[in-house]
């Protein structure tokens, strides 16, 4: 994604708020995140001076300073003595932050960011499936079997199917005992679950094929086959995304 600097008029354009937000600092932060990601304020350039931001958003200096502090915490800007507030390179941005990730996905026509997200999820969940196959007790195995059977009944109801889909993956993650891995995956999923770019094509055929993958994962965990469970999870997450994905080009980050 290449940032394209915008005109000074656009950079100082007031946001199209239909009503004045209750939390002004949060609203200003969200707007500035979007502008930075879009390239209105490119990496290496300074944010507009404080008085300009106050005028643009019709807010006080206190609100602007709070918003800039939040942008610093997200890794989008650095305050430099004598140089002002500088926009940082994308490599410094906190991509686990909801606003940053959401804005980046919205601007990324190539879907590369979602490819990276899926690749990250695939690595973590494959490892957790490996551990789950070694640790899963009868209760976990029964739960996974029940979810697979329930999803077989829901292939004509994608919305309900996806709820059980998430429950299946969460059961595997919980069975692994990896709280950090589970937290990262759940955080990533929570931030993209309502994105049409991420959900993509999810009709009956997708649900049927997807649940074949779930059944394979369940069978390998039930057989206490760590390597097989990891491979089944890796293949399932890859195949499911390739089917849902509707962007240009090949998802090269997923090729192995």
Language-model features: locations:
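Juxtamembrane/interface motifs at transmembrane-helix termini
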Residues: 65, 161-165, 201-206, 248-254
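Hydrophobic alpha-helical elements and their junctions with loops/disorder across both membrane
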Residues: 32, 55, 69, 74, ...
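Conserved amphipathic alpha-helical segments that form helical-bundle/coiled-coil interaction surfaces
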Residues: 117-198, 210-219, 228-243
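Juxtamembrane helix-loop transition sites at the ends of transmembrane segments
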Residues: 61, 71, 195-198, 246
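Short linear motifs at protein or domain termini
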Residues: 1-123, 130, 250-254
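Short helix-capping and inter-helix turn/linker motifs at the boundaries of alpha-helical repeat units
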Residues: 23, 207-208
């Amino acid at each position: 994604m290449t940032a394209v600097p915008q005109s000074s008029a656009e950079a100082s354009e007031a946001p199209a708020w239909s009503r004045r937000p209750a939390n002004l600092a949060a609203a200003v932060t969200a707007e500035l995140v979007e502008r930075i990601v879009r390239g209105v304020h490119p990496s290496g350039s300074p944010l507009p001076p404080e008085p300009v931001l106050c005028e643009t958003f019709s807010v006080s200096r206190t609100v602007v300073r709070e918003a800039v502090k939040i942008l610093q915490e997200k890794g989008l800007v650095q305050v430099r003595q004598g140089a002002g507030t500088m926009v940082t390179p994308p490599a410094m941005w906190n991509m686990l932050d909801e606003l940053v990730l959401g804005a980046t996905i919205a601007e990324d026509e190539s879907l590369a960011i979602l490819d990276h997200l899926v690749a990250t999820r695939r690595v973590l969940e494959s490892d957790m499936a490996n551990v789950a196959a070694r640790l899963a007790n009868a209760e976990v195995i029964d739960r996974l079997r029940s979810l697979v059977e329930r999803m077989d009944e829901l292939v004509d109801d994608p919305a309900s199917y996806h709820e059980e889909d998430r429950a299946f993956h969460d059961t595997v993650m919980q069975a692994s005992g990896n709280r950090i891995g589970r937290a990262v995956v759940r955080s990533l999923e929570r931030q993209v679950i309502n994105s049409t770019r991420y959900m993509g094509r999810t009709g009956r055929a997708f649900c049927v094929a997807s649940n074949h993958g779930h059944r394979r994962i369940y069978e390998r965990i039930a057989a206490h086959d760590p390597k097989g469970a990891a491979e089944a999870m890796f293949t399932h997450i890859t195949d499911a995304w390739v089917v849902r994905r509707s962007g240009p080009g090949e998802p090269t980050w997923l090729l192995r």
